[in-house]
Amino acid sequence: MPTVDSCVHVFDGTRVEASTLEEPLVRLAASYSKIDRILINEPFSRPDQRIFGNEPPHSWCYYYQKASYYRQKGDWDSIISLYHTVEKQKLIPRDSVEWLPFYAAFVMQDDEQKADEIAAQLRSNPSLVASLCNEWNKAKASLVGEENARLSSHLCNSAGK
């Protein structure tokens, strides 16, 4: 975690979208991550309550991590539903990179207005945007394709909207 206020981030080695607050060694190691080893078609399971206690209240990180999971599946509608929940609860990230699953969902669903709103949040961190654009441009030239091309086109090619 880049800071004590950040959520746990799971990296996709084909497209490293790391926080600008992340440790340099973590950023380097992230490219070796094999996100496809996460079993996305298995049901969620709860840890044993006798050992771990009650589930904590749902904060920003709960929704961010679920949105990241749904992004891996390409389930844009579920991410948008989560976004409306965090919007209603007025939850926001402390690390702007955590907007990415929500941003990706609105871009992929062609919701320009919401994508622009979140892009404005991302643009408040110019070094993050530079890093993301560099990563997406590298990745769109390789295997990952459409999502990277669309994210790059929207955030990187639209000068400051």
Go through each PLM region and give its residues.
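C-terminal luminal/periplasmic domains and tails of membrane-associated envelope-modifying transferases
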Residues: 1-161
